[in-house]
């Protein structure tokens, strides 16, 4: 039914719509939990192409430096090393929730790393998921 009452659209709605969480229940708990504590609710971080390219370049350099392979091929590091670095960087960053870190590391462990337990840059850049 149509009414004369004006609907107020919150100014943060466009940012909220960008979030598109993979786990709606987890996201809703985090979102409404943050609102109840007077904190800024989670929104999807927008990374521009040049910034993303720099991140991939940095990841490649880290993998090359830490690689246990020195005979050509793509640089690879043990998953345990990647897990330690990712967890440490996420903690230092302070904007990545521990639940996100756990989900991401679990996904990589189950779906990305090979039977040798090594992870490489191509696993991120060429993985269709």
Curated annotation (Swiss-Prot):
GO biological process: cilium organization; flagellated sperm motility; protein localization to cilium; regulation of protein phosphorylation; sperm capacitation
Subcellular location: Cell projection, Cilium, Flagellum
Keywords assigned: Cell projection, Cilium, Flagellum, Ubl conjugation
Modification after translation: Sumoylated, sumoylation decreases upon spermatozoa capacitation conditions.
Quaternary context: Homodimer. Interacts with AKAP3. May interact with SPA17. Interacts with RHPN1. Interacts with FSCB; the interaction increases upon spermatozoa capacitation conditions. Interacts with CFAP61.
Known function: Important for male fertility. With ROPN1L, involved in fibrous sheath integrity and sperm motility, plays a role in PKA-dependent signaling processes required for spermatozoa capacitation.
Domain remarks in the Swiss-Prot or TrEMBL record: The RIIa domain mediates interaction with AKAP3.
Full protein name: Ropporin-1
Gene source species: Mesocricetus auratus
Annotated gene: ROPN1
């Amino acid at each position: 039914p149509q009414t004369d009452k004006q609907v107020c659209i919150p100014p943060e709605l466009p940012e909220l719509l960008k979030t598109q969480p993979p786990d709606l229940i987890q996201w809703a708990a985090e979102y409404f939990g943050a609102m109840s504590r007077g904190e800024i609710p989670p929104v999807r971080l927008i990374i521009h192409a040049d910034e993303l390219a720099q991140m991939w370049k940095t990841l490649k350099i880290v993998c090359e430096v830490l690689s246990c392979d020195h005979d050509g091929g793509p640089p690879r590091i043990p998953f345990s090393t990647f897990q330690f670095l990712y967890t440490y960087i996420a903690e230092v960053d302070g904007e990545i929730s521990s639940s996100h870190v756990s989900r991401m590391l679990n996904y990589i462990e189950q779906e990305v790393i090979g039977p040798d337990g090594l992870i490489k840059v191509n696993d991120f850049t060429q993985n269709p998921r």
